[in-house]
Amino acid sequence: MKILYSLRRFYHVETLFNGTFVLAGRDQETTGFAWWAGNARLINLSGKLLGAHVAHAGLIVFWAGAMNLFEVAHFVPEKPMYGQGLILLPHLATLGWGVGPGGEVLDTLPYFVSGVLHLISSAVLGFGGIYHALLGPETLEESFPFFGYVWKDRNKMTTILGTHLILLGLGASLLVLKALYFAGVYDTWAPGGGDVRKITNLTLSPSVIFGYFLKPPFGGEGWIVSVDDLEDIIGGHVWLGFICVLGGIWHILTKPFAWARRAFVWCGEAYLSYSLAALSVFGFIACCFVWFNNTAYPSEFYGPTGPEASQAQAFTFLVRDQRLGANVGSAQGPTGLGKYLMRSPTGEVIFGGETMRFWDLRAPWLEPLRGPNGLDLSRLKKDIQPWQERRSAEYMTHAPLGSLNSVGGVATEINAVNYVSPRSWLASSHFVLGFFFFVGHFWHAGRARAAAAGFEKGIDRDLEPVLYMNPLN
């Protein structure tokens, strides 16, 4: 009878296995992991693990390309993107592809090209993944020492980290190049309701860029999520690209210091936990960005933010009632506060009613109506443009609320439509994924630390009923 569990203390989860179906070096007996443990079987097979990662990248890129083409096939130019359940085309539009003034889609060819390029790339990655998983060398150390590694080799691990940082830095630089030289990006703040423009006056001041990191995350401060200026966003990517490339070169050229060697656990599962922690942070930040920020995620493509939809409703009814003869500057609401306008805690003129809680909102359709002390009464009476009225009425009925089963909008809003905002989808999905990755970080970090400390004994399986049942085969 074959051994039912490995004696290696860190291979702790074992199941019965079918001895007739064996892949050399990838079965439970040789690796200590059952088939369902996935890539854990490949921990010490760098060539096969490379195949798994390349194939995984192929699946990711295939989804991007296929979903991109699916959205193009279903796209209706007459309707806004956020009213069609799109999550990929808004990203392409934000980069300035295929859109013009006001976010109007002028050409869908760039979207089609993007989808096809991703599909072709996924085929290349897929072939590479299959080759390395099935045909290539099991380990890279002998044939390709530059690409080979041992998990405990601290110097090699930081070299790999450095390579990744350089690639990330180059990725950030691609956005900078697109914004500066290749037709520009979409700026929701461009006069008259947004347009594609080249960025000509980058913000490179470290006090401005790093000032965002020092802001508190609360209220109108909003940490880095509060950025509302494309010059700052692109300038931030210049800094990001520079720091990542510089950090990458540093990690390639240097060996870990003694304090780092002592502080970190140096094994595959520990690196997995570090990666999961980083991805978790990315997920939470992306959640906040897509929910609150209407500059990096323009409302023309993603729909209004929650505060934006609320303020749009107040603005829409102010316009209507002002036309009907209401004196919006002095009308009193049912609570004794201003019905249409009131004062904020700092004395600025803001919209009255329930939307007072969102008085911090900044939006391109509203800012032209502000003066030095908040909303300017004379501008509200004389300067409201038709495009501002249209946009606020549209945003009012497309709040990013509702459940994810397509019953959306404000529950009490009689003009709401059956609609779920991409902001709802993207924010909630990234929060959930970020949370799962956070838990995964703790799980794998705990296992790695326990194994390093020498007390990871695993689960005692001796009394499990399944061990006394007949094999399935």
Swiss-Prot record:
Q: Which cysteines are joined by disulfide bonds?
A: none
Superkingdom is Eukaryota
Q: Write out the annotated subcellular location.
A: Plastid, Chloroplast thylakoid membrane
Bilayer disposition of the protein: Multi-pass membrane protein
User: InterPro entries this protein is in?
Assistant: PS_antenna-like, PS_II_antenna-like_sf, PSII_PsbC, PSII_PsbC_sf
**Which residues are modified to Phosphothreonine?**
15
| Subunit structure of this chain's protein | PSII is composed of 1 copy each of membrane proteins PsbA, PsbB, PsbC, PsbD, PsbE, PsbF, PsbH, PsbI, PsbJ, PsbK, PsbL, PsbM, PsbT, PsbX, PsbY, PsbZ, Psb30/Ycf12, at least 3 peripheral proteins of the oxygen-evolving complex and a large number of cofactors. It forms dimeric complexes.
Which protein is depicted? Photosystem II CP43 reaction center protein
Organism of provenance: Triticum aestivum
* Gene for this chain: psbC
